[in-house]
Amino acid sequence: MFDIAPVSRERDEQIQACIDDKTKPRGALGALEPLAAHLARLLGEAPEIGRPAMLVFAADHGIASAGVSIAPPEVTGQMVANFAAGGAAINVFCRQLGWQLEIIDAGMLSAPPREMGVTDCRLGAGTGPIHKRAAMTLGQVEHGLAFGRERVRSHHAEGTNLIGLGEMGIGNTSSAAAVMAALMGLEAKDCVGRGTGVDAATLKRKQMLVEQALLLHLDMLTSPESVLACVGGFEIVEMTGAILGAAELGIPVLVDGFIATTAALAAVKMFPQSREYLIFAHRSAERAHGLMLAHMEAEPLLSLDMRLGEGTGAALALPLVQAAANFYREMASFSDAGITDVTP
């Protein structure tokens, strides 16, 4: 379904030489230097971030009705209305930092009014309760991957060469934990966290329900696609499709926190070469996030103890990505500036 080329390493020596010849001691820009090299591989000799687009996928989860969150299921729709009105954290950050923001209904309980301006990519009215039955069908997974790819292609046609991913969905940390456990061969207790900030009793119930879901679907968890069908979320599936669609186009993706990283994990399990197109924005306060980052050998750009979702961490990482591209493209070399290179 996806045709993803591995990233060429033919220019690596040339790229590193370019970075080392900038008017600075070698390595003095720290983590910005490998980030700049990564962008030069993906975007060419003069990398420049054009029209960055933040895609926020919203969906509801059947497991939310079992009381795994501090918020009831209807809050998903209420927050999407807040996004549409421009009042959420992701709106503030996108306005400040120059992101193009698109809100996408991947499968909320109720479709928002057309005048709200939310893109319709609905796969259903929320997933099935994963502790009782499958979240969705394999056909819905296929359609969701295609929806995610199509949204990326639409932005790319307008000049976008960097995609940010965010999400909204009450109950989605439970689904994400189940997906993570199934894809990494872990137990529920290793993957379930406090999400929206639940108390100890709710955390115990959440862990029990995720364990129940994994046991119920054990014989079906044989591929990334079947894992998504059994225990995933509509927004997780569509983010996975967006990642694969961006990789297919050869453009990088800024991955947000725990939920978005679960989609990244699914994408990498489907197409390992898609890993090379991912930039991980921040380390979430959600405990299990670090396990996924380590599994994918990822070092995030930021660590701010955030756990909001919405794409907020990815949004805040944009200036660092721009700075890496800009210094690679604009910073003078020693010879250009007439400075003696004393680097040993």
Swiss-Prot record:
Reactions accelerated catalytically: 5,6-dimethylbenzimidazole + nicotinate beta-D-ribonucleotide = alpha-ribazole 5'-phosphate + nicotinate + H(+)
GO molecular function: nicotinate-nucleotide-dimethylbenzimidazole phosphoribosyltransferase activity
Ranges that cross the membrane: none
CDD domains (alphabetical): DMB-PRT_CobT
Gene3D superfamilies reported in the protein's UniProt record: 1.10.1610.10, 3.40.50.10210
Keywords: Cobalamin biosynthesis, Glycosyltransferase, Transferase
Similarity comment: family membership: Belongs to the CobT family.
InterPro entries: Nict_dMeBzImd_PRibTrfase, Nict_dMeBzImd_PRibTrfase_bact, Nict_dMeBzImd_PRibTrfase_N, Nict_dMeBzImd_PRibTrfase_sf
Name of this chain's protein: Nicotinate-nucleotide--dimethylbenzimidazole phosphoribosyltransferase
Active site, UniProt feature: 310
Function according to Swiss-Prot or TrEMBL: Catalyzes the synthesis of alpha-ribazole-5'-phosphate from nicotinate mononucleotide (NAMN) and 5,6-dimethylbenzimidazole (DMB).
EC number(s) recorded for this UniProt protein: 2.4.2.21
This protein's record includes keyword Glycosyltransferase: yes
Highest rank taxon of the organism: Bacteria
Pathway of action: Nucleoside biosynthesis; alpha-ribazole biosynthesis; alpha-ribazole from 5,6-dimethylbenzimidazole: step 1/2
Gene name per UniProt: cobT
Gene Ontology biological process: cobalamin biosynthetic process
